[in-house]
Design a protein with these regions (language model features):
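Conserved acetyl-CoA-binding loop-helix of GNAT-fold acetyltransferases
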Residues: 61-69, 207-212, 216-229, 233, ...
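Conserved active-site tyrosine of GNAT-family acetyltransferases
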Residues: 101, 251, 256
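A conserved beta-turn-beta hairpin within the catalytic core of GNAT-like acetyltransferases
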Residues: 42-52, 109, 196-205, 215
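Short amphipathic alpha-helix that is part of the acyltransferase structural core
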Residues: 1-21, 52-56, 112-114, 121-169, ...
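Conserved beta-hairpin
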Residues: 31-35, 93-107, 177-192
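N-terminal charged segments
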Residues: 1-79, 93-94
């Protein structure tokens, strides 16, 4: 059952506090710090670098943007380079923060819809694998490479940062990730993962890309239900997704409710 608007607003407040303002690092080598009026993550190598949360107004926004550009811009290539993301949420302030980021040289990527659902509701979904499909939990590099193969077939792109992040989590913090493949015999046709942080009320669902010839058969739904059952066994109350335009309708039919819209603003070291 989808949450009503009052409950969604309460969950959004909890999400902002727990996953943004008081965020935990997303890996053993990452560092989250509050500096000035923002919370940011910095990590060497191919990890995710960026601004998670901000408390800005018309008088403070431009100076804080400049401070973050200076911080990340000072990083050498050996540290991962200057590129970073300012993850903007539709309820962030000031209202023109996106315009200010663009004026500072950030490039917006496609927006996604932040959706959330109760884990218990999704764990109870009556889902059976489509004929010919089995699930395989990923625990090693060979499995991660199969996931990257699926991603390339589904989207036509390579994701070296995601590969490195998954390998690091599986090696250093295996309890924080659940990665799974949908297999047609020996061929991977879909892949997804769930990331969890100790003590967090939210588990994040990522991936779910499916090879074109296998779409529309319920595999995405199957992968959501599998991860929900894992999260339920760990007493994590909510599942969260940054949903693309393609996945949002599926997720809403499963009972996810909308918390807002997120837009990644990317700084690549120079103005466009």
């Amino acid at each position: 059952m989808t949450m009503d608007q009052d409950e969604l607003l309460k969950v959004r407040d909890r999400y902002d506090a727990e996953m943004r303002r008081d965020a935990q690092p997303d890996g053993a080598h990452a560092r989250v710090e509050r500096t000035g009026r923002v919370v940011r993550q910095t990590v060497p190598g191919l990890g995710w670098n960026g601004v998670l949360w901000s408390d800005l107004d018309e008088d403070t926004a431009d100076a804080e943007i400049a401070a973050q550009v200076a911080h990340f811009g000072a990083r050498g290539e050996e540290d991962g380079g200057p590129e970073f993301e300012w993850k903007l949420y539709s309820h962030d302030r000031p209202a023109d923060l996106g315009d200010r980021l663009r004026a500072a040289g950030f490039v917006p990527e496609a927006p996604e819809t932040l959706v959330v659902a109760r884990t218990a509701d999704l764990a109870a979904l009556p889902v059976e694998p489509p004929e010919g499909i089995t699930l395989r939990v990923v625990t090693d590099e060979a499995g991660v490479d199969l996931m990257m193969e699926v991603h390339h077939r589904a989207f036509g792109t390579e994701r070296p940062r995601i590969r490195e992040q998954m390998l690091t989590l599986l090696r250093d913090e295996p309890d924080t990730i659940e990665a799974v493949l949908a297999m047609a015999g020996d061929v991977p046709v879909s892949a997804a993962r769930m990331e969890m942080r100790p003590g967090s009320a939210f588990a994040g669902l990522w991936g779910g890309g499916t090879a074109p010839q296998w779409r529309g058969r319920g595999i995405y739904r199957l992968l959501v239900a599998h991860r929900a059952r894992v999260a339920a066994a760990r007493n994590i109350p909510y599942l969260q997704v940054d949903a693309s335009a393609d996945s949002r309708p599926i997720l809403e039919r499963l009972g996810f409710g909308v918390l807002g819209v997120t837009t990644p603003y990317i700084w690549r070291g120079t103005r466009p």
